[in-house]
Amino acid sequence: EAGGYALSTEIYFMYAFECAFNILKCLGELAEHYKFLAAQMLEMIRNKYWNPTAGIFTSGPEGTTAFKDEVWETAGEEGVIWNIWGIASEEQKNLIMDNLEHKIITPYGIPLMPGHLEKTHLARSVWTVYTTGYAVAAGELGKEELLVTLIAQQIRNAVFNKTFYEVYNADDGRAWRWPAQTWNAIG
């Protein structure tokens, strides 16, 4: 559905170029080319993966099924990094968070791959650690009610299931498949 592309991979390449720039600069080497490449990647991500009709970044760029069907890429780490690494402009960030709050979030958390109705280890599951990027964005934007909701969901899921789990069912909050993993409390 993403036409062989992945938003998260593009984001990682952008950040790798930023890191290369910083490392080479520290070493006194020529580094500007990598800063230029990072800026080009950011511009491409914002132009090709941003779906203005949907108000989200999609898992595939313009021209793919994912873009046409408005498939939101929240299939993992990109849910954490899009805000932290400055992928979204302020306007995009506000639209993403509004869509999250009014169209995507369930009473038990943020389901991965919204729009996919099938239940797999990804679709319709809540991976708590990936909530952190959205929680940071909610805090930065002053969306206190959403921030409290995101935190309270994780607390309730832990209390309901009597410990922390990595994955929850987006429809009923029950722990999904794997045994308890207390390290997920860090999410």
Where are these regions (language model features)?
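Short amphipathic coiled-coil heptad-repeat segments
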Residues: M44-Y49, T53
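Active-site core of glycosidic bond-cleaving carbohydrate-active enzymes
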Residues: E1-A39, I56-G187
